[in-house]
Amino acid sequence: MKLDLDFELTKTDKLLRKFEDIHNFIYANDGLSTQQTLEEFIKILFVKIIDEKKKEKKFYIDDGEFEKIKNSKESEKFTQRINNLFSKTIQEYSDLFDNEDRIKLSPLALANTINKLQDFSLINSSNDAKGLAFQKFLSHQEKDGRGQFFTPEAIIDFCVSILQPKPNESIIDPACGSGGFLNSSLNFILKNNKGVDIEKIISKNLYGFDINKSIARIAKMKLLLEVNVETNIRCVNSLKDYDEVLLKVKSDNTLNGFDIVLTNPPFGTAGKISDKKILSTFDLGYKWKKTINNEFIKTNTLQNGQVTEILFIERCIDLLKEGGRMGIVLPNGHFENASLEYLRYYIKQRTKILGIVNLPQETFIPYGTGVKTSLLFIQKDTKNVERRYPLFFSQIRKIGYQGNKNGNAIYQKDENGEILRDKNKNPILDEDLSTVINDFKEF
């Protein structure tokens, strides 16, 4: 058994090195930014998957073509072959690509990429190896100044463990980014349930929307590497017309809404939504007035602008079915500021608050922001607005990594300064996330 595990890890490391080598070659030779380099690499992975579905393989470069390009000469046959494949990719994934999209790699970078990947199958190789390699590859990019704001894996896994998704439950992230919450939910379900149909879960139960096509492609690729089935990752502005959003998720399993919403909506420097057409479709797009009974009523006056994450709160509650559960990352000010008392009233009117968990300031520093945040867990419950119930509240103090740009892991140590290890000899992270999860279960 140990030999199989070592072999699997070896395959993962080799594939990770291959991905990194390709990325570094493009970055060094083509003058693209690191984010642009990642985008081009993802395009090629989609092209390869399309080719692997065909009987006649076109994703290759022969020795003569490669030598020609390395000697600064063109190989029109090779370039045309790959461009034709990309055209088929655009047709297959029209929700993630535009007709005007092109592969923006130089002939040499494209040739090197195809050469590195042509003898490897994305569809038929081990899901564990390729999925883990791609996840490690992405985590390197996310922590290395790639310009995008992602959610730390530790926080994602924590939220999923709190809500404990089940195999038959529908899950959506309306601001999915690279798909972290969806992949973590999938892994949680597979780990805690035997004989689960992974294809059914991915094709029927997992949904992710993102306004950014490049980021949505990453989320889709992560699920495609788990199993090659139709996925429900879409490039959608989740704050636009609600009926339009619902059309994107219409299925037997989501007719009455979703069982679980997990999301980290854009906030901080994202600015405000000022489009009156969008604001008018949200209760929280209007101004609210406090009554003499310390309640709030919505007025007929639109806000001049509303921050994105507040509109996302309403949209997420809308997406839930009655009794559905939600976990969302929010700035601490939403729980404290007097000017947002109406928001807290709105949430309490439509949901039961399951818990609030405060995160340390350093949580998101390795991922691009120092905004203090908390996690809000709620259950949609519109029928019992007049009720009192105990509220779980906790504060995370140790997250298992440093609060700096690198976000290096921090491990538990004994009195001699030696790193503590578990029964499998793995170093034990210095964190209290797992303690809070157990506290919540016992609450």
Go through the PLM ranges and name each one.
Residues 25, 129-154, 160-163:
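Class I SAM-dependent transferase core
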Residues 43-139:
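Long recognition/docking surfaces used for binding and targeting
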Residues 148-263, 268-273, 330-333, 338, ...:
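Conserved S-adenosyl-L-methionine
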Residues 1-4, 248, 253-443:
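A conserved structural/catalytic subdomain of Rossmann-like adenosyl-cofactor enzymes
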Residues 20, 35-47, 111, 127, ...:
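Non-catalytic, well-ordered alpha-helical scaffold segments
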